[in-house]
Curated annotation (Swiss-Prot):
Keyword annotations: Chaperone
Gene Ontology molecular function: ATPase activator activity; protein-folding chaperone binding
Protein family: Belongs to the HscB family.
Subunit composition and interactions: Interacts with HscA and stimulates its ATPase activity. Interacts with IscU.
Lineage, uppermost ranks: Bacteria, Pseudomonadati, Pseudomonadota, Gammaproteobacteria, Enterobacterales
Pfam families listed in its UniProt record: DnaJ, HSCB_C
Role played: Co-chaperone involved in the maturation of iron-sulfur cluster-containing proteins. Seems to help targeting proteins to be folded toward HscA.
Gene transcribed to yield this protein: hscB
Name of the protein: Co-chaperone protein HscB
SMART domains cross-referenced by the UniProt entry: DnaJ
Length: 174
């Protein structure tokens, strides 16, 4: 059973987060290992496995990029374990330039202001790519969606670097 079916959700990218959380809580109550404490070992193990599956499914569907990767995995794309080389040279050049820009920000006297502007631009790029990905997933353009997800992973890693720099700047200021 796929994760969407487990939670009673349609297999599409845009999901109802409240419905996901409500169904997660219901399933957790239903399959919590404590409810099976007095049952035979086989049933206890089955409930533990089911609870683990429910947790994995919830974490996957709750996180937007993981949800997209999961949808693609249902179509045969294993983005989590692939060693795919990005062939979009314009995107790769843009990423190199963004990383260089981010590295340079840390050494500037107005680093906080520059980082805030950089972060806004990055958020806009991510929003644009996410909208593109949603359209591709809805249209079942799996190859294009997989490529867009790969690009979103780059942007996600860059966002993590932005957050790390924010922490360093805050620590230096404190």
């Amino acid at each position: 059973m796929d994760y969407f079916t487990l939670f009673g959700l349609p297999a599409r990218y845009l999901i109802d987060g409240n419905q996901l959380t409500t169904r997660y809580q219901e399933l957790q109550r239903q399959f919590h290992p404590d409810r099976f404490a007095t049952q035979p070992e086989r049933e206890r193990l089955a409930s533990m496995q089911q609870a683990a599956t429910i947790n994995d499914a919830y974490q996957t569907l709750k996180h937007p990029l993981k949800r997209a990767e999961y949808m693609l995995s249902l179509q045969g794309f294993d983005l989590g374990n692939e060693q795919h080389t990005m062939r979009d040279t314009a995107f790769l050049m843009e990423q190199l330039e963004l990383r260089e820009e981010l590295d340079a920000i840390e050494r500037k006297p107005d680093a906080e202001t520059l980082l805030a502007e950089f972060s806004r631009r990055l958020a806009q790029m991510t929003t644009t790519r996410t909208q593109q990905m949603v359209e591709q997933l809805d249209a079942q353009l799996w190859v294009q969606a997989a490529d867009t997800v790969r690009k979103l992973r780059f942007l996600d890693k860059l966002q993590q670097q932005v957050e790390q720099l924010e922490e360093r700047l805050f620590d230096d200021f404190a």
